[in-house]
A protein has these predicted regions:
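Short, flexible loop/turn elements at secondary-structure junctions
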Residues: 81, 129-131, 142, 161-164
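Intrinsically disordered, low-complexity acidic/polar and Pro/Ser/Thr-rich regulatory regions
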Residues: 2-15, 146-214
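Structural scaffold elements adjacent to functional motifs in cytosolic proteins
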Residues: 1-133, 150-151
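Short amphipathic alpha-helices and their capping/turn residues within compact interaction modules
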Residues: 31, 35-36, 143-146, 162
Length: 214
């Protein structure tokens, strides 16, 4: 099943193309362009979904939004509400997620440029529902641009995925596989036409172009 899904995903992007931005690429290129409304590569933009990721649980998001080919990750351009804490301390984002919530796994990691200057942050989160942690994970990328903050909202780029350590029968892995199968399922074969019902062509038909093997 996994190999079939990977093969189908390979056909969704141009040969050799892969969308899996590093933290530096996410906070210096992808996210700033999304915030500014500037175009991204036409093969990439359809896989960055503009939605409130914190309004739904990850299984619902997986069913509604297709993953990125070759990696199976899902990317979302969204915003999170910032809530000020005590004076002298940083702010934290409020991250509800439908009936559950996203919980940070440790402190945010600074993203720095080649000169060591901070240019953004990446926070690791894990989804918790019914008092138990699931195998849905998320990386939340934020940049230092002033345009990223609008009122009490912080605009971020999120990468949602299933933990590589998830068991084959985990709920998250099953939700992800079911959603991917629905999105990438090949079309049903057409019913064969009976020979006596197909009229003979008056002129020779051109042969169908052969699709190059991938």
């Amino acid at each position: 099943m996994e190999l079939e899904m990977a093969a189908l995903r390979e056909r969704m992007l141009p040969s050799g193309f892969r969308f899996n931005p590093t933290p530096q690429e996410a906070v210096t290129y992808t996210l700033p362009r999304l915030i500014a409304g500037e175009p991204l590569h036409p093969a990439v933009r359809p896989y960055i979904h503009d939605t409130d990721i914190y309004a739904c649980e990850p299984g619902v998001l997986a069913a509604q939004f297709q993953p990125t080919p070759r990696t199976g990750d899902r990317f979302f351009f969204t915003s999170c509400k910032r809530q000020p804490q005590k004076a002298g301390k940083s702010t934290r984002a409020v991250r509800a997620g439908g009936p559950g919530s996203w919980h940070s796994q440790g402190n945010s990691a600074d993203v720095k440029d080649g000169s060591g200057v901070k240019i953004g942050e990446v926070k690791k989160l894990r989804y918790k529902k019914g008092g138990k942690f699931t195998d849905w994970l998320m990386d939340e990328f934020s940049c230092c641009s002033e345009d990223a903050v609008v009122g009490d909202r912080q605009r971020v780029l999120c990468k949602m995925y299933v933990s590589p350590r998830a068991a084959p029968d985990s709920a998250a892995r099953q939700e992800d596989a079911a959603a991917a199968a629905a999105v990438f399922a090949p079309p049903a074969p057409e019913k064969p036409v009976a020979a006596h019902k197909r009229p003979a062509p008056s002129i020779a038909e051109q042969p169908c172009p052969q699709t190059a093997a991938t």
